[in-house]
């Protein structure tokens, strides 16, 4: 279905007001699976509006007119639409009663003949009641084209759309359903290359990639008449994506860490720690507490996080985590050794199930011969300790610190999932 929005009002063309209704309606129609092809604005002029309606009726299936339903002489939307369709204007009983009630409770207000037009609808139209104002809207289908008239003020338009128009449209149209897959460990351009065939051949469902700092999301969208139908279609596409091999032969499934628009690696780790009844601590150098702050963002963090350490200098690493200073000097603070000893020391001191540690070069200058963006992340549990090295190149200092925490959370997530598989 092709939809078109027509904003009626000279004040829009002269820049006196901003057409926020177009954005609101476009978002709502997209949620219903209705594609908006055109945005049009026309002044308060019958001939020009008739010309626009003639054009719209030839290229769109759904034409929504906003504004021009009031009592003044330049409010001519309903009259012009009725003329275009060759129909009369008639009074809607419910809207007329509301008008009667309005003036009955306001005896000082004079009820003039032009007020009556607010209760009129195009003959044959289904009324759309105005929950916050007096001007009734309407919806009518003629020769395969559906026309909708809505009031201009957003305070009246939005309730009418949400409570009157959307139910009317969803009786006969599909809804847009979406599922968001979240990836870590692959860039947007690389991911798009990997699933190029799926993107090129997409029809319904569709795939839309979005790059975020340190991660990528794929929004899978489909038009369906129910959530169950949508899930069936999205399940098929998701499985195709998961089974696709990366450039180094791995499964894309291994790079998907979760679902949802507002999900995060930090939340996934928090959820898994609670699920398995595990606790974690952290010792941070370059990230200076960023990992710990991310855990503490979630209500109930005290169930999984006992406390942690920010050991920025070599001396504090030695003093707070019981690492021999001579060994730190020998291996350097930017090393596998230091990351592992930090993780192990933090875990032992707090008697936590997991200890995570981050040490490295946030930049912009190099340190100990390591380029900016070089990070060592250690992880310790009650049985073993290990570490990884990552190089986050071409990023700002703040990005290096943030992306480092993502790698740390992903390392913990993988460890927790391995523990789940061993149960």
From Swiss-Prot:
* CDD domains according to UniProt: cinA
Highest taxon above the source species: Bacteria
Regarding protein family, the annotation reads: Belongs to the CinA family.
How is this protein named in the record?
A: Putative competence-damage inducible protein
Taxonomic source organism: Streptococcus thermophilus (strain ATCC BAA-250 / LMG 18311)
């Amino acid at each position: 279905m092709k939809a078109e929005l027509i904003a009626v009002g000279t004040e829009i063309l002269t820049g006196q007001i901003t057409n926020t209704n177009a954005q609101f309606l476009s978002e709502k129609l997209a949620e219903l699976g209705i594609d908006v092809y055109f945005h049009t604005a026309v002044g308060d002029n019958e001939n020009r509006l008739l010309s626009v309606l003639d054009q719209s009726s030839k290229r769109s299936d759904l034409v929504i007119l906003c504004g021009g339903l009031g009592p003044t002489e330049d409010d001519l939307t309903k009259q012009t639409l009725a003329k275009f369709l060759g129909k009369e204007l008639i009074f809607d009983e419910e809207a007329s009663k509301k008008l009667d009630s309005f003036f009955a409770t306001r005896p000082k207000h004079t009820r003039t003949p032009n007020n009556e037009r607010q209760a009129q609808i195009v003959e044959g139209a289904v009324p759309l009641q105005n929950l916050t104002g007096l001007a009734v809207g309407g919806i009518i289908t003629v020769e395969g084209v559906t026309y909708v008239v809505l009031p201009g003020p957003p305070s009246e338009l939005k309730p009418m759309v949400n409570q009157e128009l959307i139910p009317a449209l969803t009786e006969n149209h599909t809804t847009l359903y979406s599922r968001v897959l979240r990836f870590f460990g692959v860039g947007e351009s690389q991911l798009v290359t990997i699933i190029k065939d799926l993107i090129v051949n997409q029809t319904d469902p569709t795939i839309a990639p979005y790059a975020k700092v340190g991660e990528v999301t794929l929004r899978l969208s489909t038009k369906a008449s129910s959530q169950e139908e949508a899930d069936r279609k999205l399940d098929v596409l998701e499985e195709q994506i998961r089974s696709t091999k990366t450039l180094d032969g791995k499964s894309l499934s291994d790079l998907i860490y979760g679902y949802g628009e507002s999900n995060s690696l930090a939340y996934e780790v928090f959820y898994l720690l609670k699920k398995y009844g595990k606790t974690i601590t952290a010792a941070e150098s370059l990230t200076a507490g960023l990992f710990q702050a991310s855990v503490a963002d979630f209500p109930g963090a005290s169930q999984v996080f006992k406390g942690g350490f920010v050991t920025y200098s070599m001396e504090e690493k030695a003093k707070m985590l019981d690492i021999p200073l001579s060994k730190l000097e020998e291996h350097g603070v930017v090393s596998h050794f230091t990351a592992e000893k930090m993780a192990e020391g933090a875990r032992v001191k707090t008697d936590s199930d997991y200890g995570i540690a981050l040490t490295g070069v946030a930049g912009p200058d190099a340190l100990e011969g390591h380029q900016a963006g070089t990070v060592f992340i250690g992880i310790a549990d009650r049985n073993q300790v290990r570490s990884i090295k990552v190089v986050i190149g071409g990023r700002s200092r703040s990005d290096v610190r943030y992306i480092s925490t993502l790698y740390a959370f992903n390392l913990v997530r993988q460890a927790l999932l391995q523990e789940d598989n061993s149960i």
